[in-house]
Amino acid sequence: EKEYGSAEVMKKDDLMYAAFYSRSAAYSKNPKTPGGFFFDLETMKPLINNPGFVEALTDWVEATKYVPPGGINFGLGDEIGSFGGGQTLFSFSWDDAFVAAMQPDSPINNKVGAAQLPGAMKVWNRKTNSWDEGFNQAPFFVWGWAVGVAKKSKEKEMAFDYLCFFANEANHQ
């Protein structure tokens, strides 16, 4: 079977927005312009129509050349199966694809690794309305599936206990 470059969630209304935001963060989340990613926090003006998001969309369209047949209609399950089944070299997704690739019946079992999302060689600066050149990596956790305790927290143990309580499945019955 022919192999392809990338498996991504591209199907409309099936987490496509999440994949797009993950791709666009490196181009549009500038460390020199703190504050909102989706909206300007002072004006609440949407930021999605800035050149950083447009550049990400341009990249995404380019990536469609390297997906398997039908890949532009991949939902999350399709993306996981494509990568885990050894059809694609790269999965731009959550860890589910990695887990699928590590299954005993996967042709790529024990032949894969995981890394942060790629960065970009420029990032849009909405304060100067220009590109800042240089590498920018701004991983974006869709759905907020990450928690942590601030290094400077005065109540680290209490904060950690709080997180453990809400992460316990028994507390969600």
Give short role names for the model-derived ranges.
Residues 19, 32-73, 116-122:
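Glycine-centered hinge/linker elements that transmit conformational signals in sensory
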Residues 89-94, 113-114:
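Paired acidic/hydrophobic, glycine-rich loop segments that form the ligand-binding mouth/hinge
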Residues 16, 20-23, 53-60, 79, ...:
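Stable alpha-helical elements in mature extracytoplasmic
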Residues 1-45, 88:
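Extracytoplasmic/periplasmic solute-binding protein
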Residues 1-2, 78-81, 97-105:
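Pocket-flanking alpha-helical
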Residues 71-85:
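Short helix-initiation/N-cap motifs at beta->coil->alpha
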Residues 65, 104-173:
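Extracytoplasmic/periplasmic substrate-recognition and gating elements
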Residues 10, 95-96:
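Short secondary-structure boundary segments
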